Amino acid sequence: MNIYVANINFRAQEDQLKQLFSEFGEVSSVKIVTDRETGRSRGFGFVEMPNDADAQKAIANLNGKDFHSRSLVVNEARPPKG
């Protein structure tokens, strides 16, 4: 399952996010979206977890959790409209 994660601290690293989600199961990939021109974090990203039950557990436990002094917004990623 692909998980959308918002309100990520701009200094947070992908490996830190992976470690956080790994508490709930296997993480196959983590991507923090960056600005193309500056390379700076845009404050959101995606975590891919192969097991849907683990992903749901991570969403339930991490939505609203404080991570590097910011409250995460975590939910199932939805395909872009269009």
Language model regions located:
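Intrinsically disordered, low-complexity RNA-binding regions enriched in Gly/Arg/Ser/Tyr
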Residues: M1-R42, E48-G82
